[in-house]
Amino acid sequence: MIANDFGLDFARIRAALKHDYPRAADMPGPGLAAGPCLLKDTMQLAAFNNNQFTLGHTSMMINEGLPMYVISRAEQQFELSEMTVGILGMAFKAESDDTRSSLAYKLRHILNFKAKNVLSADNNVKGDHSLIDEVSLVELCDLIFIGAPHKRYRSIQFTCPVVDIWNVCGNGVLI
């Protein structure tokens, strides 16, 4: 988020940090990191340490604020209130059907207030009847947010702008 605020692409910064530096080889990239473990693990560690786990609490606040941050950045470039916006990928992690604590749903909830229309799709997720198929979403949307980094999204030929904080498309993560 800091890099983005200064107009820098964190994907490029991360690549430079990892270049010829094996200790940084597994440095994670940005994305809507979610799932049930961040809250659970933070609360367990805090409870073990007299509720003094500021790093964990702060990471949760940053993480939970990411959907609003991403939307705020998109609003600087696009008139969301006039657009059909899509979220491609609703699971909380790649190649999963698990939506527990998925920030893609928080992203959708906020976009419902900001955009003209909001569509969402994830062919892995079953039981959410609000989802449409991924091909239709790509065809119908004026702007797409990548909510989960499923590998199959790498091969999609998008015809509209894509907000891709996962760098699935390989074009960087600058919003």
Predicted features and spans:
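Structural/interface elements that position substrates and couple domains in central-metabolism enzymes
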Residues: M1-I175
